[in-house]
Amino acid sequence: MLKRCLLIVACTVLGMVLTAQEHKTLREWGFPTGIFQPGQYNAITDVPGVAVGHVTLIEGDSVRTGVTAIVPHQGDIFSQKVPAAIYVGNGFGKLAGVTQVRELGNIETPVVLTNTLSVAAGIEGVVRYTLMQPGHEDVRSVNAVVGETNDGRLNDIRGMHVTPQMVIDAINMAHGGPVEQGCVGAGTGTRCFGFKGGIGTSSRVLPESLGGYTVGVLVQTNYGGILEIDGVQVGQQLEQHDFINHVRKAEHVDGSCMMVVVTDAPLDSRNLERVAKRAMMGMAKTGGIASNGSGDYVIAMSVAPGNLIDSRAKTITSTVLANGEMSSIFAATIEATAEALWNSLFMAEGMTGKGGYHVDALPVDRVLEMLRNRR
């Protein structure tokens, strides 16, 4: 009985915090985008071995934040590092671990996303997680990759409520299969185009004639611009976009976006950087403008089993995709990134947070009508 009462209280509180609407991705509403097909889950976890975990922190009237962990493979990541690259679309952000990734071309930990003032907790959590793994008793240096967006309008960000243990929990809870989207994990308190943002994900599987590779993307959306969905000027029609306060009084929306791209195509860090650049093109397709105050970062990784980097090896031999075979992966990255960004909006709920501030969800019914009328 006690457990049942607690569940009822929790649901009641969440009902006051979140404004519910039916949750479907853009594709589930009947609007597939792009020319390539998604994987089974239309998620980053369609890439074999990739897992995602969330810790969502909603407490009282003002705590609206969390942690999202992306685990690139199920082995010892520190010993079997993944080829990686990071591309900075606009550098107004606090992404940790950038310089070593750029110098060495690999990532040796799970990738963690959280809020701006919890990056330090994220680093500590990732480091502690890595040090406690079997065989790491002599490890004295860990390059934790921790990204962020600023959820300080809805969340009491100054309270620094995220703890290192929450980061460890998110990593340990990471799983394959369907990925929770919307107001979860690092996307709990984010805003996007003036609406409630969050976590979004999507994937593309290339035909066998193009290699059969999978590209998966996960995003944390907290950015602005003039929302465009599959070519439809949604933000303009809804009169909700950046710079509209030059026409009528409205709040200017700014912010950041973290994009994580994973593929099983055998790529080195150089071509992964080229892939990461294409994710920014996907962001542009949504109407994002990489504004002055936006931290827009892309983390790209390859988890092709034969190309993992053995930290104990003195020489490394790998087979990588030729430059001439990259174009289809570029296109798949653009498609999956754009759809992941849109999904973060479609899957989010309106939320009330710090100081009674409220952010509405994307008005899905109106948007669907616009998309249907376009046809």
Predicted regions and their residues:
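Sec-dependent signal peptide recognition
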Residues: 3-8
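Intrinsically disordered, low-complexity sequence elements enriched in Ser/Thr/Gly/Pro
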Residues: 1-2, 25
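Alpha/propeptide regions of enzymes that mature by internal proteolysis
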Residues: 21-375
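Hydrophobic h-region of N-terminal signal peptides that target proteins for export
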Residues: 11-19
